[in-house]
Amino acid sequence: MLTVTVLGAADSVGKSCIMISDRDRRIILDAGIQLHPRRSDQRSSPPAQLDDLSPDIDVVLVSHAHIDHSAYVPALYRWGYGGDIHLTAPTKDIVKILWKDHLKIEGETHYSLRHLNYALRNSVPHNYNQSFRLLDGISAEFYDASHILGSACILLDWDGTRIFYTGDINDAKTPFHDPIFINDSLDEPIDILITETTNATRPLPSRKETTSKLTQKLLQCYSRGGKAIIPSFALGRSQEIQTYLIQEFDTFLDSYQLWIDGMILDINKIYGRYLTEKWVSKRLLSFLKENGYKSPFDHEGIHKIDEILPTGGRNKKRAFLANQEQPVIILTTSGMIEGGPIYEYLGKFDLGSDPKNGLYIVGYQVEGTVGADIAAGQRQILLNNGFGGLYNVNLELEVKRFQFSGHASQGGLLEVAKYTSPTKILPIHGEPAAQQRYIEALNSPDKIIPPHSVHPEYP
């Protein structure tokens, strides 16, 4: 009997983990963690049962690098797993940074540096559209998911049963990726579709509309002599925003400089290694070639925080930038304003108290985070001082939120179901309301597998 067991993200977004198994074989798709708002004082949560299952797992596959899909992988080695990890080449490079950062933040809550290094040594990188053997009778293939660099949908062929796991997918055209395109990728129908449903209830504006609104707001901030602060996720959204801005502003960035801070700088370096047709859109490569750039991050209007002063640490450099009179754009972490340099810019260096300045939110904000509070209208906020204490910040700058998303719309999710022609569908990675809306829109109740159940017998 072939079973599909959802160990994480059954009816929420976070700690994604799925086990596919029969009597003799067990394969894990993703092993992420659930982060909690900093004020809760909670450590991150792992997938259910995975520690106990680890010694009996045969193979692990990772769809992409985001920590809600990958960050528990090193912990598997702590609990007895000894096999390989299959992922794309960019994902392998990115998780090295993200896993080490998580170890720095939470310590050895889930794994040690030894487990992390063991996981990296056992990571096997793959390209898209190339089938590879996992076990006797089981093969896998990665398809471009258009979510972030290296993100993949995973096709498993399990003794002839075809299982398609979307991971996180995007149907919007972004600078680095074309919309996910399924109909020419799979030559046979799918038996089981395991699909994310993140945006099944949320209408999304076009990228063109959203970027136009952002650039207009940045120009307004410039015209009043303010500093524009964009808190952003280090991976994916930040690279997208940088590329949009060099395309929209180009030489105007000579006078309205874009400064990059935080882990974004490390991720930029990895993106720079994979600027080929194999991993990014032809549109981006054409743009770079036409303008004489090897990378979007080579644009003369983009500046690294370390460039500011010849000596001194980053705090000194940030203070110098914050005290400059001319308008600038500061793109920095963290995206949900839960830590990182954004705290210093808003609080310590007092940019949050100047009405000329702007705080422009470009990412999803989890309930309970500082970013969610600000997006909801709260202007008296508490920030961590880095030494276990809190201090009050009164925000008087302009605050605007922009609807960027790295996940497929409801229409995109339904297109995937249409083109894969699955016999059964398991909706996951979405709130209950999103999953219910997806099921209703699909209008095929006989195909649905409840997320808390296992798949019935399959021939």
Can you annotate each of these PLM segments?
Residues L2-L61, H66-S70, A75-E240, Y244-L253, ...:
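His/Asp/Glu-rich metal-coordinating catalytic cores
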Residues S21-R23, D157-D159, I180-N183, T210, ...:
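Short, solvent-exposed amphipathic alpha-helical segments in soluble enzyme
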Residues R121-N129, H303-R314, P450:
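Short acidic-hydrophobic, aromatic-tinged amphipathic segments that line or gate anion-handling sites
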Residues P205-T210, G301-K316, G335-E338, Q380-L383, ...:
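A general structural motif
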Residues T215-V370, I428:
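Hard-cation-handling environments
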Residues L383-V416:
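Generic long, charged, amphipathic alpha-helical segments
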Residues A417, S421-P427:
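Proline-aspartate-enriched helix->loop->beta-strand connector
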Residues Q436-P459:
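Short acidic, glycine/proline-enriched helix-loop-strand junctions
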